Amino acid sequence: MSLLASPFAQLDLIRQPEQQNEPLQAFDAADEYLLNHLAEQQPASDTRVLVLNDSFGALAASLLGKVQVSSSGDSYLGALALEKNLVRNGLPFDAVRVVPASEPLAGPFDRVLIRVPKTLALLEEQLIRLQGQLAPGAQVVAAAMVKHLPRAAGDLLERYIGPVQASLAVKKARLLIATPQDKQPVVSPYPTRYRLEQPAIELLNHANVFCREGLDIGTRAFLPHLPQNLGSARVADLGCGNGVLAIASALDNPQAHYTLVDESFMAVQSARENWQAVLGEREAQMRAGDGLAGQAAQSLEVVLCNPPFHQQQVVGDFLAWRMFQQAREALVVGGALYIVGNRHLGYHSKLARLFRGVEQVAATPKFVILKARK
């Protein structure tokens, strides 16, 4: 049980995805610091509060019923955690206005509470989108654990919002308190674009997309070894990012049917725009989601995956293991999961625990491409 006690509420919170014997809490001292800081201001019930990047719903759930709260972030799992934690604590699950980071904000807001994200490009995009959304007398407060708080975060707040005052550290957390000033309107530098030589396509990347400035080296190693001659197979790109694996595969397999899934709303938005730019009106299913959770059993012949190795600042293979399990459930008997991974992660032995046969398709000094058949 993970109990968060704040001046606003006492809540029993869980992380997403749920794990048995979860060692980590669904909140940290930075969440507590933000809530205590807001409570000191004694906000009225009609105060309009925007929460950005609420990891597992701790902030929005605490504020529900005390102020008018909206929540926006780029994580489907974060939005799912908020919903489940509201229900878990007997609160109406639809009472918080949730806006994916891929959609525009609708202010004005009197207070903005920000958890500084791992990707500062996302923070920059969010601060730019606050232009014209702040009420007179508004305050913008960002928080992070000190070890995860780069100086550049304060620089971005100063550039796009106004003067910044850093708080004292409390329980190894710190606040950056920004006072809004009139600023010249800024055009966002996002999305960014880069070109590939093979296949010869241009890819668009919204602010929070992994490796938005250029193709990551794992995918670069994977692309020449994507499965061929798929016919009318049903194919999923699991953790699709900007959609490059599915798009490259679709170009070589014109009859195959594709589903693209990612837990980042901005990744799915990027994948959708890239698919349309390269493949026009060709049909594909795209969704933000918890991997292949909800995918019908035995509904896919092929799964392509470049699995992530971190969730926010937490590093580990638990997300990859979950994806492998989901792929096994979704594949037909005889279907195959294709992955790329760092050699040192030992994915071969992990896959062998779930699949009938695992073979190495190709390898580089750093990566292996594996095929696991159900």
From Swiss-Prot:
Q: Where in the cell is it found?
A: Cytoplasm
Task: Please give one Pfam family short name.
Answer: MTS
List the CDD domains hit by this protein, alphabetically.
Answer: AdoMet_MTases
Under the heading InterPro entries, the entry gives: DNA_methylase_N6_adenine_CS (IPR002052), rRNA_m2G-MeTrfase_RlmG (IPR017237), RsmC/RlmG (IPR046977), SAM-dependent_MTases_sf (IPR029063), Small_mtfrase_dom (IPR007848)
Could you tell me what reaction this enzyme catalyses? guanosine(1835) in 23S rRNA + S-adenosyl-L-methionine = N(2)-methylguanosine(1835) in 23S rRNA + S-adenosyl-L-homocysteine + H(+)
Q: Name one GO cellular component term.
A: cytoplasm
Q: List the disulfide bonds.
A: none
UniProt main location, coarse: cytoplasm
Q: Which UniProt keywords apply?
A: Cytoplasm, Methyltransferase, rRNA processing, S-adenosyl-L-methionine, Transferase
Cross-referenced SUPFAM superfamilies: S-adenosyl-L-methionine-dependent methyltransferases (SSF53335)
Q: For this protein, what is the EC number?
A: 2.1.1.174
Listed GO MF terms: 23S rRNA (guanine(1835)-N(2))-methyltransferase activity; nucleic acid binding
Family (UniProt): Belongs to the methyltransferase superfamily. RlmG family.
* General function of this protein: Specifically methylates the guanine in position 1835 (m2G1835) of 23S rRNA.
Q: Which HAMAP family match?
A: 23SrRNA_methyltr_G
Please identify the protein, giving its name as recorded. Ribosomal RNA large subunit methyltransferase G
Q: Which organism is it from?
A: Pseudomonas fluorescens (strain ATCC BAA-477 / NRRL B-23932 / Pf-5)
Q: Lineage of this protein's species?
A: Bacteria, Pseudomonadati, Pseudomonadota, Gammaproteobacteria, Pseudomonadales
Which gene is annotated as encoding this protein in its UniProt record?
Answer: rlmG
